[in-house]
Amino acid sequence: MRLSLKSPFVAALACLVSWSAAAQGTQREEIVRIPAAGGAMMVATVLRPPGEGKRPLAIINHGSPVDSAQRLKMERPHYPSLSSWFIARGYVVVLPERRGYGETGGAWAEDYGSCRSPDYFGAGLQGAADIKATIDHMRGQAYVAPDRTIVIGQSAGGWATVALSSLNPPAVPGMINFAGGRGGHQKLSGGGMGNCEPDALVKAAGRYGSTARVPMLWLYAENDSFFEPKLARRMVDAYDAAGGSATLKALGPFGSDGHNMAGSSSGVPMWSGPVAEFLTSLK
């Protein structure tokens, strides 16, 4: 099959190649420790674009393994394509590993309790506290511009990002939630697998929205096995109805599970347009 240079597939492939090239041999990587609540020290990866001077900050926040035994075995998060996309646009990218995960270790701060009565609201705020600690620490670095930070999160990290929006941290003009939520892929008391208590997610989203004033972009794929489109719509409707300002982009299916879109290079053509448009809209 011959592909025209005007083909959308070829154009998307060209973009992917340029993002990969931008990341190779030019970005600088450093592992740092960031003070967090309770005396914890979070391990974080810092990726810097070439050149000197102060750059805007992008914080990318990871998800959580379904199997609790895997939390402390987690490798440091990478999100290479997502990171490269922001680095190519001049951002310093930071990927913190929150309390209770991987090399950071310690007690799991985001424990939401039992599946029958989950505290998704409190769990999200614990994750938000770690993101806020990352913002505060990184803004003190000589190479970071303290007046512009974009917060991005996927799955549990997306949920923590939604929670952070309720705190309205200064100089954060926008936040991006990829497939955010908690309690997915759990064994249900009535049998089968699913979300522990979807109504609790919707209620917590509304509570966050009641104080949130920072613009948000929510991205969910059609075949997300953790948080299906109807649930995503219910959450964003509750968030906005309570006073929040979120735009939901319901994207098409991605691979075998749309929940993995943010972590795959193949997902870039799906989300890059909405993300670029969102960033352009911010003051």
Regions found by a protein language model. Give the residues of each.
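N-terminal cap/lid segment of alpha/beta-hydrolase-fold proteins
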Residues: Q24-G53
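The conserved beta1-alpha1 loop
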Residues: N61-G63, Y220
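Short glycine-enriched nucleophile-adjacent loop
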Residues: G158-P169
